[in-house]
Amino acid sequence: MPYPLRFTQGQKFTLRADYEKYAQTVRQMFNNGELAAFRTEIEILLGDSDIRVMSYADTPGGISRIVAARRDQRGCLAKQHETKDSVTIYRLPSAYDIGPAIAGALAFGPPGAVSRAVFPGVTRPLTPETGMDFPEQITIRDDAEYETFPRLDAQIRQAGTIQSHWQPARKWGRHADKETLAWIDTSKGAYILSRDFFTVSPMSKKGLEDRINQLISEDVISIRAHRS
């Protein structure tokens, strides 16, 4: 299963014979049954992709697990249902829609009102000058200059991470060597963390989509360099 999709309900079969019988049924559905129409999408999602985008979020309704992938001009998305081991697969209009599809599949509140802030316990403690106590105004170094940002005090309602990757997965889970996009939805609006995790800024659907597309664009550059 591609990260973050996973089995959550334990073993469905106690006897190996029952498992093998079910596996044969799935193969038949995949080859010439109701799954045949999505054979290409399933192959792309299971590893035969150029780029895949993985979204994991802890939401009030449960864990949100979404993965989108593209190959050549095709794009698809798989969304796992929170309370059971079933996945809905969507065929996207094109390979270039995986970023918008991930952003559109996530539900969160309106953008926060603070243009840029630090969030104790979420953003990284930053400088020796500020220490670890997070005063009301926090001064951090930004582009060789020191700037002061307000502290955001709010209740976190949900939080999520998104990664893009172009290389085959060696193991299940996030990739430590890849950039992680992180976001939070709070009682004072939705925020996205800066790439260095030092601050948060308001997050809209379009803003999230743009950040995802940025991750994808960097993978496209890596693919071209690898193939040249």
Residue positions per predicted region:
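Short, surface-exposed polybasic-aromatic patches that bind anionic ligands, especially phosphate groups
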Residues: M1-S228
